[in-house]
Amino acid sequence: PENIPLRIPDIALGAEEFIGAELYPVTASLGNLSASFDGLTLNRGRTWEHKRLSAEVRALGHFSNFFGADDLPLHYQVQCEQGLIVSGATGCLFSASEWGDDDNLIEVRHCWYISQPALRQRIIDG
């Protein structure tokens, strides 16, 4: 029904719709790298990273509240990339949302982050 507010846990359901699979919050490591995932698919093909919507990320929003991963601030790119390295996933749905005091969703922005070879190598090299 339209009068039922969207609750914070429901943002994960929206991410699952974008990704097309169920997501599970997990932590993982690979060698000296570790990552925590707001969501990882069972086949480890996709990850989901969720942050609080900042003015910096809000300014990136373009069509239909999506923005390009190249526009994503570097510290978020590094986090997404490290998650892809550790999980072996091919892409990460990055979401940022703002919630009201009553746990109602105010705004959400998304982008698909796909591995960037140069950044990946910098992380691997330390």
Model-based region annotation:
Residues 1-14:
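Charged, glycine-rich intrinsically disordered N-terminal tails and low-complexity linkers that flank
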Residues 13-126:
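Nucleic-acid nuclease catalytic cores
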